[in-house]
């Protein structure tokens, strides 16, 4: 379980987050949605301590994030970004092996898991394992990025606008794939997007952000049927009902 308690982040005169309170249950697929600059990416960067709050605390399984060993915390967290961060001079298999090698897996364990996961995302290792990132399409590169994030069997998967640069077909395929893998591996997934359709499709619950504050946290159907504010209603194309 991940819990934000009265979390704030302030840069000089700008409040990036203000008094954020949010509880994310183990195994939940939580989507953070809102316009650019609303604080979505800041929230997930705080989980693996790329950013530190100026006020409040974030807890993982009842323990403050800042009390975890930083290296162990990051090795237990998968991260998938919009900018596909594969090392260009390493093959697909070598890119995927980086985290397992840090965890001292054997070569046999790495090879077996790499083959298994690449098959799940439709990239057979015999055909794709030896390729460089430059030899892959954008959608294929992001599939490799997902495998690399998942191979270490993280408890938490952070996904920051991972599909926004892809074509519509690749995006739809990867949305389905991500949800399937989330369920199969039982991870807690925190997914950032500005796309409300994507949020509705993927989320167990949605947290709607505006100007560094959470306006509503609810299941997709509740967001649509009972938006808490005019902002939430407008964002999702509806209206507030009394």
Regions found by a protein language model. Give the residues of each.
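Conserved signature/switch motifs of ABC ATPase nucleotide-binding domains
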Residues: 134, 152
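Short helical segment in ABC ATPase nucleotide-binding domains corresponding to the A-loop/adjacent helical element
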Residues: 93-101, 111, 115
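Catalytic Walker B motif of ABC-type/P-loop ATPase nucleotide-binding domains
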Residues: 157-160
